Amino acid sequence: MTEITFKGGPIHLKGQQINEGDFAPDFTVLDNDLNQVTLADYAGKKKLISVVPSIDTGVCDQQTRKFNSEASKEEGIVLTISADLPFAQKRWCASAGLDNVITLSDHRDLSFGENYGVVMEELRLLARAVFVLDVDNKVVYKEIVSEGTDFPDFDAALAAYKNI
């Protein structure tokens, strides 16, 4: 998919598309304390990567809460990645009262977005998407939501995550 819609208007996705069965490419993002983080930092764990345009919107807030609530019952790790500033992500976590949520910022280089094909070119934000990786970083599930303001398929993503 190289085009989605956002609020009904066409948006072009930039970056390298990855597919189920591929090994996930590395990326460099920042945590809430401005520390550099890469995929290798989560080696040996299954991962549910929830990608949101902005943590400060209602749909993104609900997506982050749902995946963290449901997937945290399993062994593994849940990462929420957006192009928000780390300060905004930290503030959101504090105001939401969520201490165990891992939010990562791709604002600096869009490394994650470029390597996973989810940069919304016209907006310089990340498209709503979900990637599930096994312990070897093989992509076992991928969804790029076709309308950026819609929810992902929670049931399908969580089933893929639980079945690893």
Swiss-Prot record:
- Taken from the UniProt record, the cysteine pairs bridged by disulfide bonds within this chain are 60-93
- Record-annotated active site: 60 (cysteine sulfenic acid (-soh) intermediate)
Is the Kinase keyword given for this protein?
no
User: Which UniProt keywords are given for this protein, alphabetically ordered?
Assistant: Antioxidant, Disulfide bond, Oxidoreductase, Peroxidase, Redox-active center
Q: Which CDD domains match?
A: PRX_Atyp2cys
What GO MF terms are annotated? thioredoxin peroxidase activity
Name the Enzyme Commission number(s) assigned to this protein: 1.11.1.24
Q: What class of enzyme is it?
A: oxidoreductase
- Xref: NCBIfam families: PRK00522.1 (NF001808)
Entry similarity comment? Belongs to the peroxiredoxin family. Tpx subfamily.
Further comment found in the protein's record: The active site is a conserved redox-active cysteine residue, the peroxidatic cysteine (C(P)), which makes the nucleophilic attack on the peroxide substrate. The peroxide oxidizes the C(P)-SH to cysteine sulfenic acid (C(P)-SOH), which then reacts with another cysteine residue, the resolving cysteine (C(R)), to form a disulfide bridge. The disulfide is subsequently reduced by an appropriate electron donor to complete the catalytic cycle. In this atypical 2-Cys peroxiredoxin, C(R) is present in the same subunit to form an intramolecular disulfide.
Note the subunit structure. Answer: Homodimer.
Q: Which HAMAP family match?
A: Tpx
Q: What is the name of this protein? A: Thiol peroxidase
Q: Which organism's genome codes for this protein? A: Staphylococcus aureus (strain Mu50 / ATCC 700699)
Upper classification of the source organism reads: Bacteria, Bacillati, Bacillota, Bacilli, Bacillales
